[in-house]
Amino acid sequence: MSGRTILYCLPIAECLFGALATLALFVTPASAEPPKQADARNKPLEVAVFEKLLAKHRDLTYDELTAKLKQRSYLDKLSFDPTQAPSFDLVAKKMQLTKEERGIFARNAFVSIDQNRRHTFASAYYQIYTGDLPVLVTSDSILHAMHRSYDDILLELETTLFTWTIDQILADSHQALAEKASANKDAALAANYRDVDLYLTVARNLLAGAGAPEKATDQPNDVWPGGLLVPSRLEMDKEVLAILKHVQSLKLQFPKRTPPTEIYGGTRYLDYSQFKPRGHYTKTTELKRYFRCLMWLGRIDCGWNVLPTDGTPGIESDSDRELRDAVLLCELLQATGSLKPLKALDDIIAFMIGRSDNLSVFALRNAMKDGNVKALADVKEAKALQRVQTGIRNSKQAQQMIRSQVVISDPDDPYYKVPPPATFQLFGQRFIIDSFVLAHVVFDDIIFKKKKQERMMPRGLDVLAALGNNVAVPLLADDLRKFNYSANLLASREFVDLHKPEFWKANLYNLWLDSLRSLHEDMTEHKRFPETMRTKAWQMKQLQTQLGSWAELRHDTILYAKQSYTAGILCEYPAGYVEPYPEFYGRVKYFAEEAGRRFEAADYSIRNEKLASQLKVIKQHQVSFFKTMAESLSSLQTLAGKELKGEPFTAAEKTFIKKTIDMRGGGSGPPRYDGWYCNLFYRRPECAKWDPIIADVHTDPTNNRCLEVGVGDVNFVVIAIDNDKDRGVYVGPVYSYYEFHQPAEHRLTDQDWQKLISTGKVPARPDWVKVFQAPARERKP
């Protein structure tokens, strides 16, 4: 028995979740045999490119990293006293600025104010409106509207088209399986029928409500007392029930702590805590069930390993058997006519989020075609199976770019990084570039001077640094020096920069990230850019904007994205200014235009007459909404461009800003918000709904914790703007961003997070926001 220590790790870009997890635990190995090296033949091109970039920067230090970064010429001081700017006294009085808030404003010419009230972006705009204050149209507010609309559209599709289609595909495939199994006379293939029966029966039970808590824990109630809701067709009830009980437990299986799951003739450790519904999936019982079902159909460790794992520690599988399982499922999908609706559904998810980071049904079918294989019976013999395996290897579409299950890595072996297995899933998790970044700035990807660095938890700042925000890098200095991952961070940035415009336009997720990238464009040399916005403090505020929007993006895609494990009222604002980022508004406009085109072209056909009629109306609403959104963004882009050119606004453009928001009396009912800002919300009547969100984006089981990122109450920014010789003070709404550690067994839902905010129990904001953020005010009753 060797005395060395092995580090179990899951740099889990968790398949359907908001939690890229690098899971680690020290244990004693059973054998001192050196691990086999990864098969380079299976590596995706992206991984090979990243590794070359990483090798180029081997052993890079933090000081060497910062020396390579382009430095900006930030303004050290302003040419005017912001407290003497016209309208400051009015704004200070109306906003009741505290001594500390005045101090930060005097120093930076802007300050972020937390009134400790349950403000939304719409209600914040309305407070500015009712206070007769000059309005600042913020990038934060535009991004938040984009989040709300994206999330609502996804939810709408899930509760109509997606749920019905998946239910039908599973039911049809299960029936066909039973028929084929009864006709099978080959005992050697019986295990494959049982494996696929297990896979389908678990999925159907989860969609029917199995796996829910035994007792009601929150609203809406979703309870499962036990027992199968859909029976196995091949006497696999016991095995199915065992997995459903694991799902109900929400426990993380881990070496030396728990036994693994016996599945598909082998064993593996599954993180069942990831089956806890989060994001918008807690809103209805049906969504909770859909969440669990898609988790099963998407998590890599629930799928089939289709190429040999070469004895990868932590995984025991028969890849020949599991590849036959996948071939059988493809055969069933073909026989039942399920490929067309499956492809239509996959295409919608692909243009909203991205492509699968695993072997998909369609990629496997291509390999089967190349190997002259149509059915399970065709791969009974080893030679036929090998032809399919060769096709899979040649396609390089099976090897994951982000590892997503429990494996074991030796911290003392600097030459071996555990490769992610080649895995098949029906609705596999999607590759997203920010998860790729997070997966490469943690153990076991960091090697410095021939020693693996045990950095178990990434930070949101890693993503922004890789996306090109230089302000984020010094904020990571402590981590970079302690864990020596400067080479990984620089390689990640260069990897991101290598992607051509087509990549950023490939899907709505990438378009969203690309919009965020435009907010750290260097405008310090632009003489018409407001002096206040040419300071480092302002760029820190924009960093918060980016992180807040990124948290909303990860929240919205938590199930699909692969993650690394309100008075004397005037009816207008007296004056207004738009944050002068024309490129940002242009990219969001393109997001809206492209979304409109993609949704119009999407296949919503369904074998349900009532739903088909409903989906026709839904599509018309989606296309019309994005057209209106694009028109508003076009106006903002024009206004921002004019500000930078020093051109005056037309009367119509002035009216546009003044009509950002309004609120009409509701008579005996509630008031109704109005204005172009409300038109940016897919569900317009809910534009002022209070909805702070939270998402766990990384898990560290060694310390039993996860990393949570979220946004809280909307804050106000008070800012002095010099627009040529015209100076004024404006007020606008901005994000409040939170990032903190939470016990892994208590991952937060939006409802949990909102309760913490309402009771004043939120954790501290990141230290770096203190540059522009005043302390939260006392809560007023």
Describe these PLM feature segments.
Residues 1-10:
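N-terminal secretory signal peptides that target proteins for export/translocation
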Residues 2-3, 25, 314-315:
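Short intrinsically disordered, low-complexity coil segments enriched in acidic
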Residues 10-26:
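Bacterial N-terminal signal peptides
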Residues 30-32:
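Boundary at the C-terminal end of the N-terminal hydrophobic targeting segment
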Residues 34-781:
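Long, non-catalytic protein-protein interaction scaffolds
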